[in-house]
Amino acid sequence: MDGKYYNLWSTDNARTDNNDDVVIKSVYDPSPVGYSLPASNAFTGFTTTGQNVGDGYTPFTPEQLAQLNINGNFNKGYYFYTKPNKSGKIFFFPASGWRYHNPGIMYEIIKRTHYWAAGPYNRNIGRNLVFSSFHIYCLDYSGRNAGFCVRSAEEK
């Protein structure tokens, strides 16, 4: 990563805030044809507040659990609802782990994971979802040189 570009995964997007702007797929987007990385706000429906929940180290409190738009408990991932207030269909996001750029090994398989979004945080850091049994951060950001999961969305 040379830190020169904001828009590696969304050609017309240099905004560094979380947003729902249309993603214009770039040649660097790892998604298959017809799909792209989702907008940076795509994962905000995973909590009722659209904000990060939990601290990543201690179990959820009853109040925090009420803020999660999930079906059941963490079981090597979460079943998230497609609509607000625990409604709609459910779909599974596995806790697949992640790969840090150095030394390039996998971490926290079935315990924690990250999923990339298209939006930048700055030139070196991208937006993503991260979760474990102790937190769901739908508005997270991490160095773009890490190997995270991709959950592509159909292009608009």
What are the functions of these language-model segments?
Residues 2-156:
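C-terminal, surface-exposed recognition/capping segments
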